[in-house]
């Protein structure tokens, strides 16, 4: 840690405590993530270290840059570029109103970051407003990319705060283990709806069952016809057969018709039918300049 001075604590992350830090040579402000490792562990698993070191190669303006990996006696500190606030805090400052141009800009930046990582075969797996960071220039950056693969997604944050299910797709809630890029696209859809509603989450489930019910009340309950193989997923449970809603304009009233169309292409229960990040970036919601109206 000699290279960095530890300053004040910024918060608790999924994997450990986050501090503000300063590079002693360049005076650059950074974020220091101290990763908590299990006490009975043999220190840092080599597989995790390999994964983490690969992430240093991911350089894109919409990805929070991993600057350094400091590894010593069972301690692992990840040094990231520092951003001013996360999307959750940004929402809290809004008082329930968001400029639709800002909503669109943030969503496009989110998709650009996703497309870049997906093209390098890196998934996020735990996207949520808390790990979308925003700097003073209105640039949005994805944080904690690839960490889920290196460390696993814990059921509880080490600070005992429960890891949110609100952005998890139905396939993962049903126990699917083979993750593809589609997991992040579902989360992106949940975030688009939340952006358009100035920070009100679309599916705020209290547990796995409640989460699935909230989703199916909107999208309709899937079955073997609409989603072949769904009933064979390891944690599948038969749920009441809800019809899909007919009016998305009531669900996300602030979002214009093109935005709603994109949302419907992201929020599809069957994972292989969700739109990709690359395709979503080309959607008329972003390309049509008259898109601000309804």
Swiss-Prot record:
Gene Ontology cellular-component annotations: cytoplasm; nucleus; protein kinase 5 complex
Molecular function per GO: ATP binding; cyclin-dependent protein serine/threonine kinase activity; protein serine kinase activity; protein serine/threonine kinase activity
Keyword RNA-binding: no
Phosphotyrosine PTM positions: 15
Active site: 126
Phosphothreonine: residues carrying this PTM: 14
Keywords, in A-Z order: ATP-binding, Cell cycle, Cell division, Kinase, Nucleotide-binding, Phosphoprotein, Serine/threonine-protein kinase, Transferase
Tissue expression as described in the entry: Abundantly expressed in all adult tissues. Lower levels found in larvae and early embryos. Barely detectable in late embryos.
SMART domains for the chain: S_TKc
Positions carrying Phosphoserine: 159
SUPFAM superfamilies: Protein kinase-like (PK-like)
Occurrences of domain Protein kinase (ranges): 4-286
Catalytic activities: L-seryl-[protein] + ATP = O-phospho-L-seryl-[protein] + ADP + H(+); L-threonyl-[protein] + ATP = O-phospho-L-threonyl-[protein] + ADP + H(+)
Binding sites annotated in the UniProt record for ATP: 10-18, 33
Gene Ontology biological-process annotations: adult locomotory behavior; axonogenesis; cell division; centrosome localization; determination of adult lifespan; flight behavior; intrinsic apoptotic signaling pathway in response to endoplasmic reticulum stress; melanotic encapsulation of foreign target
EC number: 2.7.11.22
InterPro entries: CDK, Kinase-like_dom_sf, Prot_kinase_dom, Protein_kinase_ATP_BS, Ser/Thr_kinase_AS
Top-level enzyme category: transferase
Listed PANTHER family: CELL DIVISION PROTEIN KINASE, CYCLIN-DEPENDENT KINASE 5
Function: Probably involved in the control of the cell cycle. Interacts with D1 and D3-type G1 cyclins. Possible regulator of neuronal differentiation and/or development.
Recorded family membership: Belongs to the protein kinase superfamily. CMGC Ser/Thr protein kinase family. CDC2/CDKX subfamily.
UniProt protein name: Cyclin-dependent kinase 5 homolog
Gene of this entry: Cdk5
């Amino acid at each position: 840690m000699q290279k960095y001075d530890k300053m004040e604590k910024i918060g608790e992350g999924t994997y450990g405590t986050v501090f503000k830090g300063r590079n002693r040579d360049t005076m650059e402000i950074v974020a220091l993530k101290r990763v908590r490792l299990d006490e009975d562990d043999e220190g840092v698993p080599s597989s995790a270290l390999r994964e983490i070191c690969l992430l240093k190669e991911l350089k894109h303006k919409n990805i929070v840059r991993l600057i350094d990996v400091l590894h010593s006696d069972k301690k692992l500190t990840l040094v990231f570029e520092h951003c001013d606030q996360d999307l959750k805090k940004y929402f809290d400052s809004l008082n329930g109103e968001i400029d639709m141009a800002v909503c669109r800009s943030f969503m496009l930046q989110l998709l650009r970051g996703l497309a870049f990582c997906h093209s390098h075969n890196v998934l996020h797996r735990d996207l949520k407003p808390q790990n979308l960071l925003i700097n003073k220039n209105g640039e949005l950056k994805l944080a904690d990319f690839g960490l889920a693969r290196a460390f696993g997604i814990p059921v509880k944050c080490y600070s005992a705060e429960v890891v949110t299910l609100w952005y998890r797709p139905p396939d993962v809630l049903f126990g699917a283990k083979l993750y593809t890029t589609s997991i992040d696209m579902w989360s992106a859809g949940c975030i688009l709806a939340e952006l358009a509603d100035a920070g009100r989450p679309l599916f705020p489930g209290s547990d796995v069952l409640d989460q699935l019910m909230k989703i199916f009340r909107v999208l309709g309950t899937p079955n073997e016809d609409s989603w072949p193989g769904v009933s064979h997923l390891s944690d599948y449970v038969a749920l009441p057969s809800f019809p899909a809603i007919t009016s998305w304009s009531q669900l996300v009233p602030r979002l214009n018709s093109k935005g709603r169309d994109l949302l419907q292409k992201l929020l599809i229960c069957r994972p292989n039918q969700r739109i990709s990040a690359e395709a979503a970036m080309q959607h008329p919601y972003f390309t049509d300049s008259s898109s601000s109206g309804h």
